Amino acid sequence: MKPRRHWWVWIFVGLYIWMIFRNSLMIAEASSALSAKVAYRLIAIINRYGFYIDFYTFHHYVRKLAHFAEFAGLGFLVTMAMHICPLFKSRFLNFVLFLIAIPAIDETIQQYVDGRSSQYFDMLIDGGGFLFGGLVCYVLVLIIKDLLFRKNRQEKTA
């Protein structure tokens, strides 16, 4: 049996998941204040260019984008960790386990936090972000492998 030398990459995945769960444990007021601060800064930038947006609508989209971005980062990290040291023989199982389990646990945590609620739509956004991050990582891995393959082939022919 082949020893798993690079298991430490999963520590980064675990720390990132902890960060996601920590954000979900914020009470509604703190979470809303944090995203409102981001929304105000973005609206100030957008207003400079002559576009005016309703704050409450924009704030809603900032919150949804935060869900997407959090899980895009997770998808990227999980895909990278899968390429380095898969947890299971099936890379598909590795990916799907995180794709389904982490958003479900995240939304379940929010059910028990003061002022927060669990929403299926957020799970879909989380899953979409995870898939996007995984796809970006996969494409980057393919590009890097292709560049290395070309470099090796050029060295052999020279």
Where are the model-predicted features located?
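"…centered on the first transmembrane helix and the immediately adjacent amphipathic helix/loop
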Residues: M1-A72, F76
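Membrane-interface helix-boundary motifs at transmembrane edges
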Residues: K2-R5, M82-S90
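Alpha-helical transmembrane segments of multi-pass membrane proteins
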Residues: Y16-N23, L99-D106, G134
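Membrane-spanning helices that line or support transport/gating and their immediate boundary helices
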Residues: A33, T108-Q111, I143-L147
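Membrane-interfacial alpha-helical segments at the cytosolic side of multi-pass membrane proteins
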Residues: E70-C85, G129-I144
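Membrane-embedded alpha-helical segments that form the functional core of polytopic membrane enzymes
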Residues: K89-I102
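Interfacial helix-loop-helix junctions of multi-pass membrane proteins
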Residues: P103-G127
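Short, charged juxtamembrane terminal tails flanking transmembrane helices
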Residues: K151-A158
